[in-house]
Amino acid sequence: VAGAVWSLACEGAAVGGLDLALTSDVPVGSGLSSSAAVECATVLAARDLFGGPSDPARLALLAQRAENEVVGVPCGIMDQMASMVCTAGHVLLLDTRSLAAARRSRAACSWWR
């Protein structure tokens, strides 16, 4: 959580103090990208309070930076991008090099039954 706020501050946001409470049904360490989801939720909450970028890809990069540089996990960007841009009932098409992302609805995916 602190790493996500630090990452936003590194982006130039005038971050101040905050009290933050997180709740989740996702078990920690379950392999369901819970750390990426927490980082993204924290970046969004801090951004809403203190300002910062609005581009979802930029916000995902800030969350990834927290995981890489503060937590010490050399993760890629996929989990953070999924947390930032996915919507229920859709599949995410993501180019992790360019961060180009597109969503397709279940109805548009003939293979998704």
Residue ranges and their predicted role:
Residues V1-L62:
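Anion-binding (especially nucleotide phosphate/pyrophosphate-binding) glycine-rich loop
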Residues G51-R113:
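ATP-dependent small-molecule kinase catalytic core of the GHMP/sugar-kinase superfamily
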